[in-house]
Amino acid sequence: MAGHSKWANIKHRKAAQDAKRGKIFTKLIREITTSARIGDPDPANNPRLRAAVTAALTSNMTRETINRAIARGAGGGDGEQLETIVYEGYGPAGSAVMVECLTDNRNRTVAEVRHAFSKSGGNLGTDGSVAYLFSKKGLLTFVGVDEDALMDAALEAGADDVVTEEDGSIEVYTTPNDFGTVLDALEAAGFKAQNAEVTMIPSTEAELDAETAPKLMRLIDMLEDLDDVQEVYHNGSISDEVAATL
């Protein structure tokens, strides 16, 4: 898990850009609506919905907007029927890339994703080609808190692991199903997460340099600009020096 923050920072940088374009709200609402449609409309009983609601709140979406999206999904009806599809592929320096999509047209989506890979010097793989390199986990990030107190509270709440990064931030890992429970317990104990999400954590990393890092960024940009793409995960590791130039 070491180095997770390095590639997470890329995602957070891109998320900020998306927010400026207004795209992130659209994608969050689609995820909330779909999660409520295919599962329990109560976030407390639906880990996927809870994660989507948490992400929306982190992005400053109002409770009213979130509740409307949940109600629309729970109501079913003739609304947009979307399915989740995950594509796998390879980026520069052999980096592994997973692309999570919500779509109503598989043919359109796979064509757009394949085009992004080919234009960025990567290639779309087959099912299972890189998925084995990732594990789905809940991730809560904290800054400026007492490390020992947080660790005790997190482990008592059922967290899998607690890791202190080089920059002093503390990352708490959970199973996807325990994400909401641990988040609630830590908030009740007075710990406010700077970021909380269910994400894909790589087991190995691909080191990227000043030449290959911009190519990965181009691929991520192209993929996240696609309307059907919800999330992009990768195992590229970029040093602080190289990241500062991006």
Swiss-Prot record:
Where is it chiefly localized? cytoplasm
UniProt keyword terms in alphabetical order: Cytoplasm, DNA-binding, Transcription, Transcription regulation
Query: Which SUPFAM superfamilies does the entry mention?
Result: YebC-like
Highest taxon of source: Bacteria
Give GO terms for biological process.
Answer: regulation of DNA-templated transcription
UniProt subcellular location: Cytoplasm
- Which molecular function GO terms apply here? DNA binding
Q: Which GO terms describe its cellular component?
A: cytosol
Q: Identify its protein family.
A: Belongs to the TACO1 family.
Q: What is this protein called?
A: Probable transcriptional regulatory protein ASA_2843
